């Protein structure tokens, strides 16, 4: 593809060197057997993961070491976090606040890369719904997937209207099932996730009841802490491949949308809405920006008793967000 040529040799050399420096410390105290399989996820809410998988760049890189690449589809942050915690994948894609919740509750993950800054969730109602405001959700059935950004977005949104989780009837459904329930009239509202949310808008005329970009947390590429310590060089190579996919997507947005359309089985218009208008790929390096965003979002976890009392969430944010890599890249 012609867009790949945009990735200059100098950039890749800087990336490799910076990542090595940024992650070397993680493996300084760990000795591990050679990697036998690279296990990671892909997700429709992470378009660059679809690009990376489609072009086989990881397979190409690891083939010389005789290491196969195993891809697992994550239907939501909750699934990716389950896979990470169960040691069935080593690298997984989630929302930032969902990753923080998981880390606070004992899932040993770290985040050395940010795959997007999205507006991937909002509160959705049918086009003819009488619901006009957040206050109207009181006593209503609202579908949302627990342990994901849409669920946490719902809780934060309710809080702005003086409501809490107990003021609605939460219906815990996986994202696709939540949309199906909304279309069938089984719930009054749904805390959506792209590309399903974009499909609801364009294909069903659904209305976004409440949007708040700042309540959408970043797309975090999480690594099991043990794996990061034992295989920092391999993590470096995965991040370098993600960077290649990010650069290609920025240069070939329509082509990337076609890949998203084919993989997620949505129309090209839906994929373009998600990728062009609601996905920011400009800042992949974990930094103070991401730390501050999670610190601002974290109080909802304690307000709704989603973490144990007394958990120091600022400390957990520091344990999760691995800013060493980003700081090194910025100096390169």
Question: Positions of the model-derived regions?
Answer:
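Pocket-lining segment of extracytoplasmic ligand-binding domains
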Residues: 97, 170-171, 176-262
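Short, surface-exposed acidic
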Residues: 66-70, 165-168, 264-275, 308-315
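Sec/Tat-exported extracytoplasmic proteins
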Residues: 62, 88, 93, 103, ...
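Conserved C-terminal helix/tail region of periplasmic/extracytoplasmic solute-binding proteins
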Residues: 301-332
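N-terminal signal peptide c-region/cleavage motif recognized by signal peptidases
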Residues: 25-27
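Secondary-structure end/capping motifs
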Residues: 231-307
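N-terminal secretory signal peptides
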Residues: 1-7, 11, 15-22
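Short, glycine-/small- and polar/acidic-enriched structural segments
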Residues: 31-164, 170-172, 188-191, 208, ...
